[in-house]
């Protein structure tokens, strides 16, 4: 009788190590780019939200001939302000259904009068603090 040699099926240790090294290199190249894109997407989303709030502020101004004061804040776009200066006309249902938070979960900052225009509207960015550079830079309505 002939003895048959059984061939083992599987990968050698060297083959497995080569695959692990290749996957590690790919992860080192891809992960930083993906993480950076997420922050870019959040910054873009904040800029879009600022534009939407600006549109609501313009509708408010068209109805009442003025922008909400800093004391009234952006809440004046959701509910009619009860502190002066009260708007002469106020749209039923407000100008926004609710105030959005920025992509990092913080409220937008609104100041009237603004340092850069009739009002300043901005997100504090990823760091949650005014000013900053890079990913922590504020997203504003004037830049």
Model-derived regions, located:
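N-terminal leader/signal peptides at the extreme start of proteins
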Residues: 1-11
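Short, surface-exposed interaction loops/tails
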Residues: 3, 40-44, 51, 55-58, ...
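Short beta-to-alpha loop/turn elements within the nucleotide-binding domains of ABC transporters
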Residues: 11, 29, 72
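Alpha-helical hydrophobic helix detector
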Residues: 17-33
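Short, glycine/small-hydrophobic-rich surface segments
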Residues: 57-98
């Amino acid at each position: 009788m002939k003895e048959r040699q059984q061939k083992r099926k599987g990968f050698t240790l060297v083959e497995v190590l080569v695959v692990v090294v290749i996957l590690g290199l790919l992860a080192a190249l891809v992960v930083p780019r993906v993480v950076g894109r997420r922050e870019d997407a959040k910054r873009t989303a904040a800029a879009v939200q600022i534009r939407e709030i600006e549109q609501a502020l313009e509708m408010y101004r068209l109805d009442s001939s003025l922008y909400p004061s800093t004391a009234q804040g952006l809440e004046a776009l959701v509910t009619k302000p009860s502190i002066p200066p009260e708007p002469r006309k106020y749209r039923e249902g407000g100008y926004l259904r609710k105030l959005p938070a920025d992509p990092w979960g913080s409220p937008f900052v609104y100041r009237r009068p603004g340092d850069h225009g009739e009002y300043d509207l901005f997100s504090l960015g990823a760091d949650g603090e005014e000013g900053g550079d890079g990913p922590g830079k504020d997203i504003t309505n004037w830049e």
